[in-house]
Regions:
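Leucine-biased recognition of intrinsically disordered, low-complexity hydrophobic segments
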Residues: 6, 21-22
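Non-transmembrane, aqueous-exposed alpha-helical and coiled segments at domain scale
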Residues: 24-53, 59-206
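Bacterial N-terminal signal peptides that target proteins for export
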Residues: 2-12
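Bacterial N-terminal signal peptides
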Residues: 10-20
Length: 206
């Protein structure tokens, strides 16, 4: 009987130690990012979500912030987002991560949709008022997002080479330029009526 009691106590001790261990280990993954004093607060949140500081994610966030503000939404639950563009694969598809961070719309909540298209458009609809804002990037924003060389291949040893480090630094520099672009350089923001938004969505996806 005493042996059984000791085993029970030991079992519970192991259980609680395991729970404490799991609780202590619960944390988000560490992104590849060194914060700089001039970085806006939203950039740090975007990097935490995306994993590193890249120009396409930064571009998506900037353009989506502008559209969200123009539509008059608070974000997360009071909006629907439609994104159009050539985002089938990275690095361009990283744009979609930036949009999710900036609007709070996510695929889990089913309030964001991507439609393949040649031209980039971010369309935000305010669910409370019906107001729709459509954002299209400027040539300057697109030029910044695309002006980097492909990442060099990883060496057989798996170690980061000096060339890879330079590539990452270039990406981060471009992303920071996008983060600090004047609002008027981001692109055009147009306020649409719901019927106009539906028509434009169909036209631009063709």
């Amino acid at each position: 009987m005493r042996t059984r009691a000791l085993c029970t106590v030991a079992g519970w001790a192991v259980f609680f130690c395991g729970v404490c261990l799991l609780a202590g280990e619960a944390k988000l993954p560490d992104p590849h990012y060194d914060f700089e004093p001039n970085d806006p607060a939203w950039l740090k949140q975007a990097v935490q979500f995306h994993g590193h500081l890249g120009p396409w994610a930064a571009a998506g966030a900037r353009l989506a912030i502008a559209a969200r503000d123009a539509a008059g939404t608070k974000g997360y639950f009071d909006l629907e987002v439609i994104v159009e563009g050539p985002f089938a694969q990275p690095p361009k598809s990283c744009f979609l991560d930036g949009v999710q961070v900036a609007t709070g719309a996510t695929w889990g909540k089913r309030n964001i949709e991507w439609k393949p298209a040649d031209q980039i458009v971010v369309r935000v609809r305010n669910l409370r008022t019906g107001q729709v804002a459509e954002a299209r990037p400027s040539d300057e924003l697109i030029k910044l997002a695309t002006s980097f060389k492909p990442k060099p291949k990883v060496s057989d040893s798996g170690d980061s080479s000096a060339e890879e480090e330079r590539h990452d630094e270039e990406l981060e520099a471009l992303a920071r330029k996008i983060a600090h672009l004047p609002a008027e350089s981001l692109g055009t923001i147009t306020l649409l009526k719901p019927r106009e938004a539906s028509k434009n969505s169909g036209d631009s996806a063709r």
